[in-house]
């Protein structure tokens, strides 16, 4: 048996080697080591790239199995967006662009799942987030109902944080089966959008 010491894996705590860095694109690589093999028994190469095109940043992940057998893995990001100076988290409105609905679900609502105590997807439906024309304000107490809103079944194709009615940041999440939305509203001025 192998134990993962943290719910977020080991890669985030390791030093990546720069592979390519120019004006609009950077790539970094992490390869397995005896230290990683003790936690994760696979030979791998993980490359993470960031590309800037105009006002859009694209994040890319490439995982390569260096063995001949099957390699199990899970990957995800932890993007957090800081509230502009002089503003509050409560100045934001969420705008969800819908991709699909569960059976019996209204177009202006999203079903969210109850996360496990470790923060993983449980598969258990926790509730329904009501939307008005795809939007809901981030009000004080918004995260009292759910510390993390976790949407499944690729219900959301993109999510925007609106500030003064205009997109402050928009994240596409078409290719992801889950989207987590959370904040530590009382202590940290950021909002996390995690595909």
Regions found by a protein language model. Name each.
Residues 6-12, 80, 172-179:
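A short, sequence-level motif marking secondary-structure junctions
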Residues 19-26, 51-56, 85, 164, ...:
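A short, structured loop/turn motif at beta-sheet edges
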Residues 48-50, 57-65:
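Short, well-ordered beta-strand segments enriched in hydrophobic/aromatic residues
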